């Protein structure tokens, strides 16, 4: 889509607002919400809060972000027990993300080893002196394996480990003040966004053979979906991140630097990128070869799940408090966003926005 040009006054001085393109105006998957959302939210929130991973003030901000809503939008058509696992997973992701954002590379690596040991040994008690993320991870997986089939479990463990090691790379970039070019950023971000383990839940009752799962077209569809999630996430998170001086791992900032363009130009550039990805996905998602039943039905459901994930991420970005606080629904409709001023030190240390 064409991004509206700011007024002449805004162009001649520092911008005070920007326009978020409606990248999903023609996306065929409608918003849907799992009917078990409220129950899963209550249960998952109680599970997560009992570990006291955040200060009371940060926990309040964390709850307002409602990561259970994200899961219930993304897994709208899955059974309640799988949706509950999805809620727990989103909460686990953001416990890891929020804490690792303040860690150096070596500290993140320690966490990664703890988390993976907990996932591989869900019945083994965790050491008393270990960071609480170990027990959070253990109990998450202890519950998840009750409703995820063997193939789903295998893919989850493999891709969650890949996600964690990408978080180490992100921490290393942060330690060394690295600003990546767009292509290398996308390579790392495809793993740090956590989409691949999230997609493993779509396979909860499937047994897709590796040759089907790794078919080049299905690989492409997965990558195009992930890239749309990245662009959509970074468009919505940019304002908060630039105000915190934490936009070095956001494609908006990287496009501005790489292409030497302003914020408006970056929004248009990213909108065009997203349009290209959506076009490729929609032109190809019905062109998978046939392997016979039940594989064809599994592949169809899996791809439908990918398409729904794109809509879910967009809907949550505006309905949640995380990026726009109480102004999300207006911004979703009107698309104009007021640029936030630099956050003060108290804002950065007292909440986990």
UniProtKB/Swiss-Prot annotation:
Belongs to the terpene synthase family. SUPFAM superfamilies: Terpenoid synthases. Mg(2+) 3 binds at residues 233, 237, 241. The lineage of its organism: Eukaryota, Fungi, Dikarya, Basidiomycota, Agaricomycotina. It catalyses: (2E,6E)-farnesyl diphosphate = Delta(6)-protoilludene + diphosphate. It is an enzyme of class 4 (lyase). This is Delta(6)-protoilludene synthase K435DRAFT_659367. It comes from Dendrothele bispora (strain CBS 962.96). GO terms for molecular function: metal ion binding; terpene synthase activity. The DDXXD motif is important for the catalytic activity, presumably through binding to Mg(2+). Keywords: Lyase, Magnesium, Metal-binding.
């Amino acid at each position: 889509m064409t991004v509206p040009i700011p007024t002449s006054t805004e162009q001649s001085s520092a911008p005070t607002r920007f326009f978020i393109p409606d990248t999903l105006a023609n996306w065929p998957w409608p918003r849907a919400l799992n009917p078990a959302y409220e129950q899963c939210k209550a249960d998952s929130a109680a599970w997560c809060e009992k570990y006291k991973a955040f200060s009371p003030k940060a926990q309040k901000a964390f709850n307002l972000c409602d990561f259970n809503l994200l899961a219930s939008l993304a897994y709208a058509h899955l059974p309640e027990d799988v949706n509950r696992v999805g809620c727990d997973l989103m909460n686990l992701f953001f416990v890891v993300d929020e804490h690792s954002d303040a860690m150096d590379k070596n500290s993140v690596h320690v966490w990664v080893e703890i988390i993976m040991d907990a996932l591989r040994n869900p019945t083994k008690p965790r050491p008393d002196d270990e960071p609480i993320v170990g027990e959070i991870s253990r109990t998450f997986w202890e519950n998840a394996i009750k409703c995820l089939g063997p193939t789903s479990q295998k893919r989850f463990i493999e891709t969650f480990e890949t996600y964690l090691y990408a978080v180490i790379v992100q921490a290393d970039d942060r330690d060394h003040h690295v600003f990546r070019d767009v292509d290398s950023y996308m390579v790392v971000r495809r793993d740090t966004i956590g989409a691949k383990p999230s997609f493993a839940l779509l396979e909860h009752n499937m047994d897709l053979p590796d040759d089907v799962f790794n078919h080049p077209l299905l690989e492409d569809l997965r990558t195009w979906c992930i890239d749309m999630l990245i662009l959509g996430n970074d468009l919505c998170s940019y304002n908060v991140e630039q105000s915190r001086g934490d936009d070095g791992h956001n494609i908006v900032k990287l496009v501005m630097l790489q292409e030497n363009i302003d914020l408006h130009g970056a929004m248009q550039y990213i909108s065009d990128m997203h349009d290209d990805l959506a076009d490729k996905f929609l032109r190809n998602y019905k062109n998978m070869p046939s392997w016979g039943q039940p594989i064809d039905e599994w592949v169809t459901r899996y791809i439908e799940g990918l398409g729904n994930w794109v809509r879910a991420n967009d809907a949550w970005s505006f309905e949640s408090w995380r990026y726009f606080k109480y102004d999300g629904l207006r911004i979703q409709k009107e698309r104009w966003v007021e640029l936030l001023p630099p956050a003060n030190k108290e804002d950065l240390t007292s909440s986990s926005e």
